């Protein structure tokens, strides 16, 4: 029968070391905020907030067109917040199995199309649902204007995401690992 060893070497580690490493990885990437994609995301968040806040301050529930505008504005605003946080804290680097440039491209193209429909619905319904010069008229007109600006911002993001997905101006593998923002 085999002898049991008289000495056993063991190693211990502090659990605080592992926690500190994950906290330091959660630092915000200020380079993303300064990039074209980061600036456009901030613009989309601010302008999208203006769109749904202006519509929400009117009796929008009486008109189906504004229900659609509210759905598009709030839904895309929330999804943009999620993507902004993912890129700001570099969580896309930890989720490397997700093709982030393609995901962003699909999202931004879909967001552009949805905001085109929301802008058209909002702009077309202003005269039909409000008296010219009234407070709801002015708010809905302003919401239409900001919806147009958000639509343009999402379109620009789709263009930049397409370039990142194609790898224009850089190695495609480097673009994937760098998060695809310039």
Curated annotation (Swiss-Prot):
GO cellular component: apical plasma membrane; compact myelin; membrane; membrane raft; myelin sheath; plasma membrane
Membrane topology type: Multi-pass membrane protein
Residues spanning the signal sequence: none
Modified sites of kind Phosphoserine: 9
Record-annotated membrane-spanning stretches: 36-56, 69-89, 100-120, 142-162
Cell inner membrane is among the record's keywords: no
Modifications made to the protein after synthesis: Phosphorylated.
Extracellular side: 57-68, 121-141
UniProt-recorded Gene Ontology molecular function terms: identical protein binding; structural constituent of myelin sheath
Domain MARVEL: 32-166
Compositional bias ranges of the Polar residues kind: 7-16
Expressed in which tissues: Detected to the sciatic nerve, brain and kidney. In the sciatic nerve, found in Schwann cells; in the brain, in developing oligodendrocytes, especially of the corpus callosum, of cortical white matter, in the optic nerve and in the stratum radiatum and stratum oriens of the hippocampus. In kidney, segregated to the apical surface of renal tubular epithelia.
Compartment(s) of residence: Cell membrane; Myelin membrane; Apical cell membrane
Region of interest (Disordered), residue spans: 1-20
Record's keyword terms, sorted: Cell membrane, Membrane, Phosphoprotein, Transmembrane, Transmembrane helix
An annotated GO BP: monoatomic ion transport
Main location: membrane
Cytoplasmic side: 1-35, 90-99, 163-182
Subunit structure: Forms oligomers.
Function field: Main component of the myelin sheath that plays an important role in myelin membrane biogenesis and myelination. Plays an essential function in apical endocytosis. Regulates epithelial development through the regulation of apical endocytosis. Part of the intracellular machinery that mediates basolateral-to-apical transport of ICAM-1, an essential adhesion receptor in epithelial cells, from the subapical compartment in hepatic epithelial cells.
PANTHER family: MARVEL-CONTAINING POTENTIAL LIPID RAFT-ASSOCIATED PROTEIN (PTHR22776), PLASMOLIPIN (PTHR22776:SF9)
Name this protein carries in UniProt: Plasmolipin
């Amino acid at each position: 029968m085999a002898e049991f060893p008289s000495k056993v070497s063991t190693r211990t580690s502090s659990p605080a070391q592992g926690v500190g490493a994950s906290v330091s990885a959660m630092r915000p990437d200020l380079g993303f905020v300064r990039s074209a994609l980061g600036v456009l995301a901030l613009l989309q968040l601010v302008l999208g907030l203006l769109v749904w806040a202006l519509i929400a301050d009117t009796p929008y529930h009486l008109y189906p067109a504004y229900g659609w505008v509210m759905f598009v504005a709030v839904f895309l605003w929330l999804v943009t917040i999620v993507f902004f946080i993912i890129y700001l804290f570099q969580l896309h680097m930890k989720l490397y199995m997700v093709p982030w440039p393609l995901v962003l491209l699909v999202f931004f193209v879909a967001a552009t199309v949805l905001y085109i429909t929301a802008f058209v619905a909002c702009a077309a319904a202003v005269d039909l649902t409000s008296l010219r010069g009234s407070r709801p008229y002015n708010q809905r007109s302003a919401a239409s204007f900001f919806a147009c600006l958000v639509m343009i911002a999402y379109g620009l993001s789709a263009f930049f995401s397409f370039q990142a997905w194609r790898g224009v101006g850089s190695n495609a593998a480097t673009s994937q690992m760098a998060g695809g923002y310039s």
